[in-house]
Each structure stands twice: as C-alpha cells, then as structure tokens.
C-alpha cells in the first residue's frame, strides 16, 4: 500500500539520528548497491518498507530510556502539520513497533519546542511480522528544523519472545523504522 509521496516535505532531505543504524535501508532502485547513497539513507528516500523485505527499513538497537531522535533541516521555515512513519513488528527478530511519537520544531536547530505527542497502540499477535504505519497530526507550525522522537515498543523476554541466547533476560526491543514523512 504505497501512497504517493508528493508533498512529503522530507523526500530526499538528509537527516541526522542519535543512534547508529544497523540496516540502513538506503536503496533508490533495485539495482542500487545497498549503502551506495549516503545522502538520504532509508528514512527519506521515498520508498516505503514492507513485511517481506529488510530494505528499505532502518534498524536501531535501542538503549532503555533513550528515544530515537530524527532531525531534518528543512532549509527554510516550512509549515508542518502531520508526520507519518512506519515501524515493524517481528518479535522473533527482537523488533516491536513504536510505542510513542513526539514532534518538535526549531528555527535555529538549537532551541526546540514540542508541539505534539501521541502514544501509539498496536494490536498484534504473539508472533509474526507486520508493518504498521502511524501518523500524528497537529496545529500547523513553522519549522526550519523538524525533530521526530520515536519511543521503542517496550521490552522483550529472552527465550520467550525470541530464541534464547546468552544475553540479558529482558531486552529493549529494537526499532525498525521506515520512511518518515512530513506534510
């Protein structure tokens, strides 16, 4: 289910994240060498991820208490009123969908103002693999810098939700995010 990305303010924009990416999902066409395009990576390349493929998903191993922060410089003051992103459910691979999202705007990239936040609820089975799409809408705001903070989906139990390993009994779920869009 791919909506046209026209009007998406973030397409092709470079961004920063506060975590190192595992899978970087940076692919422009099927023949592109994964990792070849360093400018936009997988979160603003106009490609939606799906259940069946690990591209163009971007994976983040989350540390408890530290939300994923995604920051885009929009070049000039731009009106924003909606953010959309995808996240993946696949507990066997230690992945849960996002549990919350917050949006902050800034004129200078230093002082940010939080303009919206939302808790996200997903119905999912014990096992399997599902791609969820979430959105958050808010009063139109001016942003030169847009920050999207995404909360991971909680914790998973070693040997219960995923195959037992020597790691800790309870781990923070990884976040696999796809195509953050703003309108």
Where on the chain are the PLM-derived regions?
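Aromatic, loop-rich ligand-recognition surfaces of beta-strand-rich domains
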Residues: 1-6, 48-116, 130-183
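Predominantly extracellular/luminal regions of secreted and cell-surface proteins
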Residues: 4-48
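Short, surface-exposed linear segments at secondary-structure transitions and domain or protein termini
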Residues: 20-28, 122-131
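Solvent-exposed serine/threonine-rich low-complexity stretches and specific carbohydrate-binding patches
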Residues: 114-124
């Amino acid at each position: 289910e791919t909506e046209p990305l026209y009007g998406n303010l973030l397409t092709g924009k470079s961004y920063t994240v506060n975590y190192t990416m595992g899978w970087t999902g940076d692919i422009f066409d099927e023949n592109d060498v994964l990792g070849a395009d360093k400018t936009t990576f997988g979160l603003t390349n106009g490609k939606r991820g799906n259940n069946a493929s690990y591209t163009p998903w971007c994976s983040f191993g989350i540390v408890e208490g530290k939300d994923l922060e995604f920051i885009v410089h929009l070049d000039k003051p731009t009106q924003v009123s909606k953010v959309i992103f995808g996240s993946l459910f696949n507990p066997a691979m230690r992945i849960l969908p996002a549990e919350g999202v917050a949006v902050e705007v800034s004129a200078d990239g230093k002082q940010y103002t939080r303009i919206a936040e939302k808790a996200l609820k997903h119905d999912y089975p014990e096992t399997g693999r599902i791609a969820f799409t979430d959105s958050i809408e808010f009063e139109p705001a001016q942003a030169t810098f847009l920050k999207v903070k995404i909360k991971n989906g909680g914790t998973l139990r070693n040997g219960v939700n995923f195959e037992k390993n020597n790691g800790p009994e309870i781990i923070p779920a990884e976040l696999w995010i796809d195509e953050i869009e703003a309108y």
